[in-house]
């Protein structure tokens, strides 16, 4: 029975000798390793057991040298057995021989390399690829590979491994290739662009490593052979100069990482959030104002890039962008005598090199601060377009408009303080002025005063404006002077679109807050309506809004004819909501073509708080149509020759024609119904019911001077009802008592006389006032009475029916 199943079996060392032949020779070769204590020169493969750890095996006869390993781990290799004579080579004891590992490598086993060695191998691969690309002038490959090795260098420096010698060789290699290539020989645009990019980068990198490059140029062969042990942390192939100060190293690392981020912007494979996190970390280690400024100039656009594919920037990210812009402006305020950022500064080749001081001792940095403010404002408007306007979120979001306006004013004052050239100042202030007007032109005078006061309260005391002075803030004419001053400055610009926009802003504000006649004269004298259809959609929408506001301004003064004339052409359109920019962004996205970008669609609509109430527009136009067309319709049907006026499909005449055809006529429900019932009452001469129906319209509450308007409207309804009554009943009466008419329509007698005399003279009605001016005598004319009209109509129908029932005999 096998010894493994025998309960009293005692293992004998000698018994294993007979089982040695079970080991194959191939397995013995793989496990062969000589022991330090083995001195026997034998051809057998007993080296599997000849480790010198126990003395018990020394007593074994030479006959037992062929014995099979025994014990609970007999099947393991000698290196892993506890009693097999071999110690574990993974637990490197004092008697471990590295020849085992070397033999494994010779047998083709995988070698584990350190991260440092892998990095060097990757750089060597880049060197080889660039060498191959040089032969074919493949500058696209050279540019990509040089960009790759630059990123590898950043990895090496992050691990404190220094600059590899192979990197210096690659820089020298690319520099020689650039010098040996003429740009004129590169016909392909993409290749030429890659060549220029590589040329700029290698120039910068070579300048950063001047000492190492000079060392390599002097003796390239011995460059790799020199020891690189300047510091303990350096390794083969890496050099770190210990003579450089820590501050300089930190500064170089700051701008190196910043340049890497700048180069990575715009690439599809780059994670924007990781770039933002890296920039935020750089801000924590920045020390000098120049470092803060350059970091913020990179961080702010990176935040906007992160949300470029979204409908609008998330509110938390928007607030982060707002805080970054505010911090940047605070730094610029504190260092205004040392550093200034504007769009007219000279560009610099390397970001780590601060610009040179000008004659005033100021270092001017190239950048566009107001571009950040504009983008922030655009994202704010997009968010308003995407948020439900009837929700509380919209009102909460709208509170941030004051913060935006503060930044606009702050940027304007910074430009005035830093730009000395008048031409540059005018160019720079154009966009801030347009944005300021864009935020205030549609508001009332009181709201604008509140916004201006809040904005000036956060402005540093060092800033003053010669265009919009704070000293006049308490003046009653401050807002009027502000709007007029900004518009006047913009109207002098060479850009025609800016000129028209500024004039329209001023006209809208004037029509809303001041008086109609001034706004009308401004519109006519400016001729802003000329070629308005050739400009972009946003300017056309603004023009339409100005026209509507001009009509509403005329209605507030009870200038009914002027209001009707202004609104008639505009309301004849079936797309009033679209031409006023008051449709939803979602609807525009569905109806617009695929080629229209999100910004183009956003320019075609306005936020909800800027809308003009469409119900108010309809009510105003219908009321004007009521007061103009009802008397004329009555005169026409009475046989009086009147001048026909153009009317739109939305006029009261169309509504009355449709109403008379209805089989069921219920009480008024909609706004149009109330105006319609007011018209029916006016046709009967019942002015009190007409006024009653008009006053029940709730849209009048949107007018700032509602009671004044309604009182003026009531007086006008009385006058037009008097005219309608006179036209309707002059065929039935031979005379009209002035006192009776004054009592009936609640008007003074002199007013009744004035109205009827003007109507008689205008329409040439055969009637006159007696000498006592108490009675209007009506002369009988060619017109027929209602009874005679019915008789003529009945006679005509009788003849038609007779011919139909009794046809002539000669007709078939």
From Swiss-Prot:
Keywords of this entry: Cytoplasm, Initiation factor, Phosphoprotein, Protein biosynthesis
Pfam families on file: eIF-3c_N, PCI
GO molecular function, one term: translation initiation factor activity
Subcellular location: Cytoplasm
Presence of keyword Hydrolase: no
Record's compositionally biased regions (Acidic residues): 18-30, 38-64
Top-level taxon: Eukaryota
Subunit structure: Component of the eukaryotic translation initiation factor 3 (eIF-3) complex.
Protein name as catalogued: Eukaryotic translation initiation factor 3 subunit C
Annotated source species: Saccharomyces cerevisiae (strain YJM789)
Gene that encodes the chain: NIP1
